[in-house]
């Protein structure tokens, strides 16, 4: 295996690690949004049915009925939960690709007696 191939594998590992870091950051943000929306949903649940709520749309407060607000938050939670699951799948796939790249690198470095850099 040539030095170019090893350099290419190292470059792929670096790019994939950067991608994984970005995905983990996005996952953290989605989990935070989910927790915030779950708290909001619990607060809306305890309100009386005829309560009038207000939501901020741009710079304007708009009246909204409790049922509509509850439905909106529930749909948002479903969407966020789906996005969390998607990110977890992508992260898992990326981690598997990383493991494969590391094993390829170790195999090629072992053939050439080159120490594997710790990434």
Curated annotation (Swiss-Prot):
Q: Name one Pfam family in it.
A: Prefoldin_2
Q: Which domain of life is it from?
A: Eukaryota
**UniProt key word Chaperone:** yes
InterPro entries named among the record's database cross-references: PFD_beta-like, Prefoldin
Question: Which SUPFAM superfamilies does this one have?
Answer: Prefoldin (SSF46579)
- Say if the entry is tagged with keyword Chaperone: yes
Which GO biological-process labels does this protein carry? chaperone-mediated protein complex assembly; protein folding
* Industrial or biotech use: Possible candidate for an effective malaria vaccine as determined by epitope response in sera.
Give the CC-aspect GO terms.
cytoplasm; prefoldin complex
Its keywords, alphabetically, are: Chaperone, Merozoite
Q: Report the family membership.
A: Belongs to the prefoldin subunit beta family.
Purpose: Binds specifically to cytosolic chaperonin (c-CPN) and transfers target proteins to it. Binds to nascent polypeptide chain and promotes folding in an environment in which there are many competing pathways for nonnative proteins.
Alphabetical list of PANTHER family matching this protein:
PREFOLDIN SUBUNIT 6 (PTHR21431:SF0)
Q: What does the subunit section of this Swiss-Prot or TrEMBL entry state?
A: Heterohexamer of two PFD-alpha type and four PFD-beta type subunits. May interact with MSP1.
- Identify this protein by name: Probable prefoldin subunit 6
**Taxonomic lineage of the native organism:** Eukaryota, Sar, Alveolata, Apicomplexa, Aconoidasida
